[in-house]
Amino acid sequence: MTGEVQAKVALATKAELRAAVETAKAAQPAWAATNPQRRVRVLMKFLELVARANDAMAELLAREHGKTIPDAKGDILRGVEVVEFALGIPHLMKGEFTEGAGPGIDLYSMRQPLGVVAGITPFNFPAMIPLWKLAPAIACGNAFILKPSERDPSVPMRIAELFLKAGLP
């Protein structure tokens, strides 16, 4: 904790935000049409990449945020646990059917992606909260725009890079 600047990241302009929304809108239909099992494979690959990058991410988080290394690893682990939960989302996406809900009435529900969703995350858990928001949304077929805290954006940006490497469009 030296107080030294660790990195400088420019704030997004309104035009950049609009471009991000338009890009997400354009990508979302194809992602939603990707079957849930294939979407989950991206999460599985992401977990593999995070496991390899865990120590470096914890060190980055500790330098930028001021957490201890064990606390930083815990922040990442709690986020990873939600990604692991999201691996089961294909089962949850099946919907329901009720035959004979009333005379001549059958009921069914279908679960569908919402579209473009966003996560605005706080500074105090820069790995955990983005993963809590991002993984379920992605597994369900949504496009996701992440707005990390300007106080410690490096780990959320690294998470985004790892998702790209894992195959997220």
PLM-predicted stretches and their roles:
Residues 3-93:
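Glycine-rich loop-to-alpha-helix module at the N-terminal edge of alpha/beta enzyme cores
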Residues 95-169:
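Rossmann-like NAD(P) dinucleotide-binding subdomain of oxidoreductase/dehydrogenase enzymes
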